[in-house]
């Protein structure tokens, strides 16, 4: 007889429970076109989901690298900032540096394995790539501004060293580990991570741009917020394709939970007052962004909040077409968004 206290014995029960959960999950997956296994997943053409493919091409057209961001003018600005401003910016960067890795963990561990549609897999693959660029960019910014190795190490380990960053990270990580939640619930949760958890921090950095500070930081923020806007739009598109969507009540519960955590983060734990922003208006802005996300998911607003920051008009979640028609800082890869017929090669030109 095996000892019931031994890990192996406990593991069998856990495996059995896990197997039961997996069977239920597989039954639900077969009802979802996005999750249904098919040999079609190995071949991209012919395109079955043109709107999903179009978003993949938008992501591709917007590719950039950390080396393309000029940080040479930032240090003189950084050295003139007040201690509170330096504290706020460095801690925001620490949060961001950790967060992109968590988003990627979800894409690698869950979404890329669950979704069977090749067009969506292409998008997720490219999202993983650009999230790595974001993470590198934030790490490079910390490396550039923070000269003290101990402070730098503290910031790079934000999930362990900063309780308020850990709280946000734990919320996201819990969704990755949750084997009972539906795919739809997790799509909403990670739309909240990229649409709500990032929104206030993006706004804080755009506030610095309004003041004419830190051109390298604010330019990278434009590029990253544009990317995250597309990722959030993509999550909403995937949600629209689901047959078994979570209820409006459940979706609201997930998003309102994220709003509370983000409001606490930027008005209590790391208050935007440190850089001269109004904490009450920041709370309102986070509610405004959450309402926009709910509408894009196909539901009604919860907060009925107006956008209190005029400088964020083109950066809000409404940016689905705005972002890409505006072409932030003219950063779009040439010809990627052109129709295939526009790129025909011929030999009949006169030389």
UniProtKB/Swiss-Prot annotation:
UniProt region (Disordered), positions on chain: 1-32
GO molecular function: identical protein binding; metal ion binding; ribonucleoside-diphosphate reductase activity, thioredoxin disulfide as acceptor
Induction profile: In response to DNA damage in a wild-type p53/TP53-dependent manner.
Subcellular location: Cytoplasm; Nucleus
S-S bridge residues: none
EC number: 1.17.4.1
Protein name: Ribonucleoside-diphosphate reductase subunit M2 B
Organism: Homo sapiens (Human)
